[in-house]
Swiss-Prot record:
Belongs to the NifH/BchL/ChlL family. GO terms for molecular function: 4 iron, 4 sulfur cluster binding; ATP binding; metal ion binding; nitrogenase activity. This is Nitrogenase iron protein. ATP binds at residues 10-17. The keyword Cell inner membrane does not apply. Binds 1 [4Fe-4S] cluster per dimer. Its cofactor is [4Fe-4S] cluster.
Length: 293
């Protein structure tokens, strides 16, 4: 099996890192060889696999050593649960420099040091927020990741971010091989959430590859710096991540998405009763103005 490179995008705080780590733990359980590359200055993309607060990042260690050329692969590549290989790109101090540059530096370093040659089945890039510009787009722009999965929910801004990410995918898909693999709905228990995300995926020309229900066992596992797969393998939530993993292994529906307009997104929310036309009449009105009206 050829190595598959997948990037996980989505709105900040939507649960990308948690979803990614539980997903790769399930893939490891299936006997897959996996590497996670954290592309976020917070360096929290591998903590549940390594049981650590935060992994030392390539950018931190390069600063200490002098340059990235002074690093060895074993300095930055750690192995955790299920023999999952873990790397964090890191970034500059807050307010200084471009964090996206860290992603570029990290991926180039990993390639030069042969990190991708270890008979891997999957590489997952866990990418900061919904930023698809500059360095954070590198997994897409440089054809590193061929499959993009977008984590979202039935909340308007999560859907808005997913649509924006699809616009970024289109930009690079036309000149490369990157494709959208599907939407992963990380439930926030909003009304008709699964139907809504399936409808959004359909409009984007894609699929909701899996609906991950909300369950407090995820938080209980996170407090222990563990995935649900490791913390409570018999939990129903662990089976949800296993199902997601199997669907990604078997996924053949890789598309160039068809992003929609803001008007179309609002129309979709109205169709599902999340917004109604009355909402449009109150846009820009203060509480006092609404009382007068």
């Amino acid at each position: 099996m050829a190595m598959r490179q997948c990037a996980i995008y989505g709105k900040g705080g939507i649960g990308k890192s948690t979803t990614t780590q539980n997903l790769v733990a399930a893939l490891a359980e299936l006997g897959k060889k996996v590497m996670i590359v954290g592309c976020d200055p917070k360096a929290d993309s591998t903590r549940l696999i390594l049981h650590s607060k935060a992994q030392n990042t390539i950018m931190e260690m390069a600063a200490e050593a002098g340059t990235v050329e002074d690093l060895e692969l074993e300095d930055v590549l750690k192995t955790g649960y299920g023999d999952i290989k873990c790397v964090e790109s890191g970034g500059p101090e807050p307010g200084v420099g471009c964090a996206g540059r860290g992603v570029i530096t990290a991926i180039n370093f990993l390639e030069e040091e042969g990190a991708y040659e270890d008979d891997l089945d999957f590489v997952f890039y866990d990418v900061l927020g919904d930023v698809v510009c500059g360095g954070f787009a590198m997994p897409i722009r440089e054809n590193k990741a061929q499959e993009i999965y977008v984590v979202c929910s039935g909340e308007m801004m999560a859907m808005y971010a997913a649509n924006n990410i699809c616009k970024g995918i289109v930009k690079y898909a036309n000149s490369g091989s990157v494709r959208l693999g599907g939407l992963i709905c990380n439930s926030r228990n909003t009304d008709r959430e699964d139907e809504l995300i399936m409808a959004l995926a359909d409009k984007l020309g894609s699929q909701m590859i899996h609906f991950v229900p909300r369950d407090n066992v995820v938080q209980r596992a996170e407090i222990r710096r563990m995935t649900v797969i490791e913390y409570d393998p018999a939990a129903k939530q662990a089976d949800e991540y296993r199902t997601l993993a199997k669907k990604i292994v078997e996924n053949k529906k890789l598309v160039i998405p068809t992003p929609i307009s803001m008007d179309e997104l609002e129309a979709l929310l109205m169709e599902f009763g999340i917004m109604d036309e009355e909402d449009m009449t109150i846009v820009g009105k203060t509480a006092a103005e609404e009382v007068v009206a």
